[in-house]
Curated annotation (Swiss-Prot):
Segments passing through the bilayer: 8-28, 48-68, 98-118, 142-162, 186-206, 303-323, 362-382, 406-426, 484-504
The name this protein goes by in its record: Lysosomal cobalamin transport escort protein LMBD1
Source species taxonomy: Eukaryota, Metazoa, Chordata, Craniata, Vertebrata
Organism this protein belongs to: Rattus norvegicus
Gene Ontology MF terms in the entry: AP-2 adaptor complex binding; clathrin heavy chain binding; cobalamin binding; insulin receptor binding; protein transporter activity
Motif YERL motif per record, residues: 229-232
Record function comment: Lysosomal membrane chaperone required to export cobalamin (vitamin B12) from the lysosome to the cytosol, allowing its conversion to cofactors. Targets ABCD4 transporter from the endoplasmic reticulum to the lysosome. Then forms a complex with lysosomal ABCD4 and cytoplasmic MMACHC to transport cobalamin across the lysosomal membrane. Acts as an adapter protein which plays an important role in mediating and regulating the internalization of the insulin receptor (INSR). Involved in clathrin-mediated endocytosis of INSR via its interaction with adapter protein complex 2.
Length: 537
């Protein structure tokens, strides 16, 4: 019992160290992208905190799996200390952890982040007082609070199972509803709300992560255009525009006024000339920068990283395809959320994670790598696509020049994507997320030649969805993810959409040429001349 307690403490200590690493990563990540001129303390802290909570929630996944696996021996029997009370206590500890973290996520998504966002939107108007800003922000935030309340009510009051008897009265149905409400409906309400956010995260992952998984490695492999060649092209463009301006101005040398068309063309040419000269300054700065020379020396390493990332992307895509194909061929159908009893088509990650889970914390390391990979590929997708509302581009994400409102949007999207990674990992390795490395005993008839008869032998078998409930403990993560079958069905179809968008993004990324070393300078009219270092990085 003492050894078991010591091992459990070690597991939670590693989780604590991971919390510190997450906070450090979020601080560096947010500071890297926030604008140096428009930096706001509240928006920065909000972005760091919300992203950290999402990552901490994902970090709880391997702890959950480790705890349910650690209660059983490899031969399928429970350990001596793992009685019913201890098992329930461990499950409740993880469950309360999820309750706390998911409640904080709901608070961030439906109150704090919208409030801070609308507060800074009102702050742009210099005529308004702080009191007016707070009142206006609270007024707009109230709409998000109402949405959150509706989601909680729907999750709590809508029963999953109504009476099967068609002759049952309405009173019996209402009675069953309130009986269900008193039995764990807090879990159902929270699960419904989080699943709704995860569904939005799935859409964000389809839009940004799927494209970023192809764009990031190919951009690393292709690299950027030559700075010297870009300067030469830019110089030629400057000379051409200056000559065009001189031609237009020569028309008014004799005192005649320019026509409206010539004045409009002259104005456009002058704006174009200012942009080209601004590009020239930045190109000159980058060409002479020591950072550019250092990055040039690291070019082979970037190619290696690009090849590694594309191989990892192909591994994920193949695993996700095989997992979805298994559900399409062998699942219990859409009414069950495409649950699969057993594993009929194995995929690489589904085989690897249960093996690593037996040697703690190797699965921790792999899960961390997967989550960070999703973060970086999502960030690559957001940087390439931008933040859009239908056909309207709201914000651009630029290193060192992201506005506070855009930073909040960015962390909101990443928070939702990280929420969805738990289901993505389940899709890649359903057995691992559901039961870890648990085994249970089944009786097998064996024919013995020595005794001229049959004998019964208990043999261990890996836990799956068809296993007895009293023999295999389901992770709390799985309980949250699959409380409502229709969300699981939506995730299943979303995985197919994810694969399609990845293939489209792969084709688009292959067809696109190399990026400019000052990508986005033409679009940023608010770029000041004292910020060239943002591009040099």
């Amino acid at each position: 019992m003492a050894a078991a307690a010591a091992d459990l403490v070690i597991g939670w200590c590693i989780f604590g160290l991971l919390l510190l690493a997450i906070l450090a990563f979020c601080w560096v990540y947010v500071r890297k992208y926030q604008s140096q001129r428009e930096s706001e303390v509240v928006s920065t802290v909000t972005a760091i905190f919300s992203l950290a909570v999402a990552l901490i929630t994902s970090a709880l996944l391997p702890v959950d799996i480790f705890l349910v696996s650690y209660m059983k021996n490899q031969n399928g029997t429970f350990k001596d200390w793992a009685n019913a009370n201890v098992t329930v206590q461990i499950e409740n500890t993880v469950l309360y952890g999820y309750y706390t973290l998911y409640s904080v996520i709901l608070f961030c998504v439906f109150f704090w982040i919208p409030f801070v966002y609308f507060y800074y939107e009102e702050k742009d108007d210099d005529d308004t007082s702080k009191c007016t800003q707070v009142k206006t922000a609270l007024k707009y935030t109230l709409g998000f609070v109402v949405i959150c309340a509706l989601l909680l009510l729907v999750g709590a009051f809508v029963p999953l199972n109504l009476p099967n008897n068609n002759n049952s009265t309405e009173w019996e149905k209402v009675k069953l509803l309130f009986e269900d409400l008193g039995t764990g409906q807090g879990l159902a309400a929270l699960s419904f709300s989080i699943s709704s956010l995860t569904l939005i995260g799935m859409l964000a992952a389809i839009t940004y992560t799927a494209y970023g998984m192809s764009a990031l490695p190919l951009n690393l492999i292709k690299g950027t255009r030559s700075t010297a060649y870009e300067r030469l092209e830019n110089t030629e463009d400057i000379e051409e525009v200056e000559q065009h301006i001189q031609t237009i101005r020569s028309k008014s040398k004799d005192g005649r006024p320019l026509s409206a068309r010539d004045r409009r063309t002259l104005k456009q040419c002058e704006e174009r000339l200012r942009t080209l000269r601004k590009r020239e300054r930045h190109l000159e700065f980058i060409e002479n920068s020591w950072w550019t020379k250092f990055c040039g020396a690291l070019r082979p390493l970037k190619i290696i990283w690009g090849i590694f990332f594309i191989l990892v992307a192909l591994l994920f895509v193949i695993s996700l395809f095989l997992s979805n194909l298994d559900k399409a061929l062998h699942s219990a159908g859409i009414d069950s959320g495409f649950i699969v009893f057993g594993t009929n088509l194995s995929n690489p990650l589904n085989m690897l994670l249960p093996l690593l889970q037996t040697v703690f914390p190797l699965d921790y390391i792999l899960i961390t790598i997967i989550i960070m990979y999703f973060i970086f590929t999502s960030m690559a997708g957001i940087r390439n696509i931008g933040i859009w509302f239908f056909w309207i581009r709201l914000y651009k994400i630029r290193r060192g020049r992201t506005r506070p409102q855009a930073l909040l949007f960015l962390c909101m999207i990443l928070l939702l994507i990280v929420l969805h990674t738990s289901y993505m990992i389940y899709s890649l390795a359903p057995q691992y997320v559901m039961y870890g490395s648990q085994n249970y005993l089944i009786e097998s008839n064996i024919t013995s030649d020595a005794h001229k008869g049959n004998s019964t032998l208990a043999v261990p078998k890996r836990c799956d969805a068809d296993a007895p409930k009293d023999q295999c403990t389901v992770t709390r993560t799985y309980v949250f993810l699959h409380k409502f079958w229709f969300f699981s069905a939506a995730y299943y179809f979303g995985n197919w959409a994810f694969l399609v968008v990845f293939l489209i993004g792969l084709i688009v990324s292959c067809c696109k040429g190399k990026k400019s070393v000052i990508e986005g300078v033409d679009e940023d009219s608010d770029l000041s001349d004292d910020e060239p270092s943002a591009y040099s990085a």
